């Protein structure tokens, strides 16, 4: 038996108006983004933990996608090290908080064998990504599937792109 959670969380808050300048964002923008991008995913993972723990097969390798896994959709713009553009405060900050929550969860769940990590799907040509995005949905999905199928213990607590490259925190 195996279980996997891929919580694809690409909600558009106020038609993605969170790409506002510092002088235009509100505390409500920040709070709403934090609730959607960090609080919701973390508490969903917490509620599903009993099922995930029950799905771990001790006879199989730990931290394997064919075991229990919590893989949250993040974004490269949440990388503190790679932030050279600034702005996007609500989205960037709330996804950085999600990354911290996933890193902490990976530490807390290490002994369970449940794989925990954050993944960036890429800048995808969707309603959110727009027409200037770098990849189409087929490239995104096929890359993510390939990456997911290759995950091992070394990826526990990682932050990866859809093409299996590491993103610095």
Place the predicted regions along the sequence by residue:
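A glycine-rich helix->loop->beta "capping" turn
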Residues: 1-9, 18, 153
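Catalytic loop of short-chain dehydrogenase/reductase
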Residues: 13-39, 49-110
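Short-chain dehydrogenase/reductase
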Residues: 45, 102, 141-144
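C-terminal helical subdomain
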Residues: 118-121, 130-169
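Hydrophobic structural elements of the Rossmann-like NAD(P)H-binding subdomain
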Residues: 8, 71, 116-119, 129
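Residue-level recognition of the N-termini of beta-strands and the immediately preceding loop/turn
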Residues: 4-6, 66-69, 114, 155-158
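Conserved Rossmann-fold SDR core element
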Residues: 99, 106-119, 124, 154-159
């Amino acid at each position: 038996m195996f279980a996997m959670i891929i919580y694809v969380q690409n909600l558009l808050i106020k038609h993605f108006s969170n790409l506002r300048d510092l002088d235009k964002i509100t505390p409500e923008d920040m709070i709403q983004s934090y609730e959607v991008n960090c609080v919701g995913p973390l508490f969903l993972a917490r509620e599903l933990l009993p099922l995930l723990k029950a799905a771990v097969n001790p006879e199989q390798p730990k931290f394997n996608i064919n075991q229990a896994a919590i893989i949250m959709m993040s974004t490269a713009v949440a990388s503190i090290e790679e932030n050279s553009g600034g702005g996007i405060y609500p989205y960037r900050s709330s996804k950085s908080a999600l990354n911290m929550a996933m890193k902490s969860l990976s530490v807390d769940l290490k002994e369970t064998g449940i794989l925990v990590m954050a993944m960036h799907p890429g800048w995808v040509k969707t309603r959110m990504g727009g027409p200037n995005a770098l990849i189409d949905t087929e490239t995104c999905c096929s890359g993510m599937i390939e990456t997911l199928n290759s995950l091992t213990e070394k990826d526990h607590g990682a932050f990866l792109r859809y093409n299996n490259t590491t993103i610095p925190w």
